[in-house]
Structures are given as C-alpha cells and as structure tokens.
Regions:
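N-terminal flexible/basic segments that precede or flank functional cores
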Residues: 1-17
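A short, Lys/Arg-enriched interface patch at domain edges and termini
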Residues: 2-5, 73-104
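Acidic, Ser/Pro/Thr-rich low-complexity regulatory regions
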Residues: 10, 24, 28-29, 34, ...
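Polyanion-binding surface elements
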Residues: 17-47
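Short helix-start
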Residues: 33-35, 58-82
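Major-groove DNA-recognition helix of helix-turn-helix-type DNA-binding domains
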Residues: 40-67
Length: 104
C-alpha cells in the first residue's frame, strides 16, 4: 500500500536541457499566456503566477494578463531554482527523465 518515491535525475548538462526544452516548445508560439505555461509544466496556475510575482519567472504584463516569452520560460525551466524544487509536478519529473534519455 505504500508508494515508493523515485527521485528524478538532476539536470547536469544545462545546454542539453535547454536544447531539449527548445525542441519541446518549438510548436508553441513565441509568447504564451499563463495557461500554456501551466499546461506545459504541469504546475497549478497559482504556482506559475506566484513565480512571476516574486520574479523567478520573467513575464510581461499586458492588459492585466501575464504573457511569457518562450525564451524566459526556457531560462526558468533550465534554472537550478526550478529543478531543485522539492515538490515537483508529475510532468516535471517525467520531463526530467525524458531529457536524460533525449538525443538531439
């Protein structure tokens, strides 16, 4: 009845991780809203907005709406702050495992 927690691999090669996320985000627009970032990361909308408010994730405020350029999202996804989060989303863990096996 107990679940075994397997820790995801830590992102060692930032350049490879950056190329991985660039390939994953290639189909998305260059500037996206919070909903697209939520869909991609698997984190709650409030969490993503909190990252923006405290300055961890850079975003543009446009008509009372946050817009996130793809390059800012990739910077955040490759950051130590993001990858050292204690409570990772399932999608975050899956992407870390996939990035480890990924070849460009």
């Amino acid at each position: 009845p107990y679940k075994i927690r397997i820790h995801p691999p830590c992102a060692k090669d930032e350049k490879k991780l950056r190329r991985y996320y660039e390939s994953k985000l290639a189909a998305l627009p260059d500037v996206m809203d919070v909903a697209a970032a939520v869909d991609f990361t698997g984190y709650n909308r409030r969490t993503v907005c909190q990252w923006i408010r405290v300055g961890k994730l850079k975003a543009l405020s446009l008509l009372q709406k946050y817009m996130i350029p793809k390059c800012y999202l990739i910077d955040w996804l490759c950051s130590d702050d993001y990858n050292n989060t204690n409570r990772k989303s399932r999608r975050h863990i899956d992407m870390l495992w996939e990035a480890q096996k990924w070849r460009d």
